[in-house]
Design a protein with these regions (language model features):
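Radical SAM enzyme [4Fe-4S]-AdoMet core and its adjacent flexible, acidic
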Residues: 2-15, 19, 23, 176-177, ...
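Conserved alpha-helical substructure of the radical SAM core
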Residues: 5-7, 27-180
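Flexible mid-to-C-terminal extensions adjoining Fe-S/redox cofactors in radical SAM and related proteins
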Residues: 7, 12, 28-29, 34-35, ...
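Short loop/turn microsegments at loop-to-beta-strand junctions
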Residues: 72, 304-306
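Processing junctions and N-termini across compartments
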Residues: 74, 78-81, 295, 313, ...
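Short cysteine clusters
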Residues: 80, 84-87, 301, 319, ...
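Generic structural signal for helix capping and beta-alpha/helix-loop junctions
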Residues: 94, 139, 167, 191, ...
Length: 392
């Protein structure tokens, strides 16, 4: 029979097992479960990469045991051909350090050997998903080596890109080296709006080309967009949701948060009303956020338990938008750092709201501590620490 487990989560009872090379899903009692399309995709993965498919199928069993299986975002390089208005990584980039802060970053950087170590540790913990991000991965000269170091036979590899360099040849190449999914940034179907938001004339045409190239290469596709204040009420946003739904492609919506370049644009940060409207749209369109229940599981805020980021200096942050480290991989093992994060009162307990997007107390602490910092993220002890408390 292979892997057999019973999963009970919020409103869900799910029995999953692997028989031969087929993923079987039984006894589904809730919404948001595996669609026929999703089952076909997973069965295809099982045929091509059975080891990864079995790890993905085992995530529910891990959660039932109280274990975590976060997606690992890997930021080896912050080099980027765009300078987006809302970029959360801008303050990590050499151009910002050089031109704005007039400093250099002499911290030790992760290399291919270290990425191999991270991949091995992650595999030993049962983790299965890596997102190569940055920066812009497709400007990295060593992208092929990074993919190989992660090991696409052991981990599901996703590339997060603005699409500028993603043509037919590049998409086919990414498929050939083991990449499984492309996450493409698309902020508006109005060409001028998208180009202005990305500060890159021509970027709309390039990302539309990239959508076709991704699909034609047989890669899985996810569209991502940044939601700013008031946007859920606009026809332009509804058109974007409809565009994704018509193409049967998921649209991942990231809230604009008060970090990175958005600290200069407080008017971008969404309101509770925006978030509530978006939740209503989830029932009509193929749109979701990091807070959306999936396959019957509702983690709430996914810090540590659902996602982590490995920065170019080996720091691990519990969220792409939180500039506090929970440990450095040159000082501690991945397991030690994850355990530390889950013990932290801000990060470990279930919370129904987005910590950096909706919690005023934490946002205030984060803003005060990161303001004026020359190097991010703040290391363990300066941002998060063992003395953290939710009580004043």
């Amino acid at each position: 029979m292979g892997i057999l487990f019973n999963r009970k989560a919020v409103g869900c009872s799910l029995l999953v097992f692997i028989k031969g090379r087929e993923l079987i899903v039984l006894d589904v009692l809730s919404e948001g479960l595996l669609t026929e399309e999703e089952k076909l995709k997973r069965n295809g993965l099982l045929a091509r990469k059975p080891y990864i498919a079995k790890k993905l199928a085992n995530i529910s069993a891990m959660e039932a045991r109280g274990e975590i299986s976060p997606i690992i975002r890997l930021e080896k390089s912050y080099l980027c051909n765009f300078q987006c208005t809302h970029c959360s990584a801008e303050y990590y980039m050499d151009r910002h350090l050089d031109k704005v802060l007039h400093v250099t970053d002499d911290r030790k950087k992760i290399d291919i050997a270290k990425i191999k170590d991270i991949s091995k540790e992650a595999d030993e913990l049962g983790l299965a998903r890596f997102v190569i991000t940055g920066g812009e991965p497709l400007v990295m000269r060593d992208l092929d080596e990074v993919v190989a170091a992660i090991d696409p036979e052991k981990h599901y590899v996703i590339v997060d890109t603005n699409g500028w360099f993603l043509d037919d040849d590049k998409a086919k190449h990414l498929k050939s080296i083991g990449v499984e999914k492309i996450q493409l940034s698309l902020d508006s179907l109005v060409e001028e709006e998208h180009d202005d938001f990305r500060n890159k004339p021509g970027s709309y045409k390039r990302v539309m080309r990239a959508i076709d190239s991704t699909v034609n290469a047989g890669l899985n596709l996810l569209l991502s967009t940044v939601l700013i204040r008031g946007q859920p009420k606009t026809q332009a946003f509804l058109d974007l949701c409809q565009f994704a739904t018509d193409r049967n492609v998921g649209l991942y919506v990231s809230y604009a948060k008060p970090t990175g370049s958005c600290t200069d644009h407080p008017e971008f940060v969404i309101t509770k009303e925006d978030a509530d409207i978006l939740r209503q749209l989830e029932s009509k369109y193929k749109v979701f956020t990091h807070m959306t229940p999936s396959y019957g599981s509702f983690k709430g805020c996914i810090t540590v338990k659902g996602i982590i980021t490995v920065t170019s200096t080996g720091e691990i942050t519990p969220c792409p938008y939180i500039d506090f480290s929970i440990g450095n991989l040159y000082e501690n093992s991945l397991k030690e750092i994850l355990d530390r994060g889950m013990r932290n009162p801000w990060l470990g307990p279930h919370r129904p709201d987005c910590l950096i997007g909706e919690d005023p107390k934490f946002i205030k602490i984060h803003t005060e501590k990161t303001t004026g910092a020359k190097h991010l993220p703040l290391p363990w002890g300066q941002g998060f620490s063992g003395d953290d408390s939710l009580i004043d």
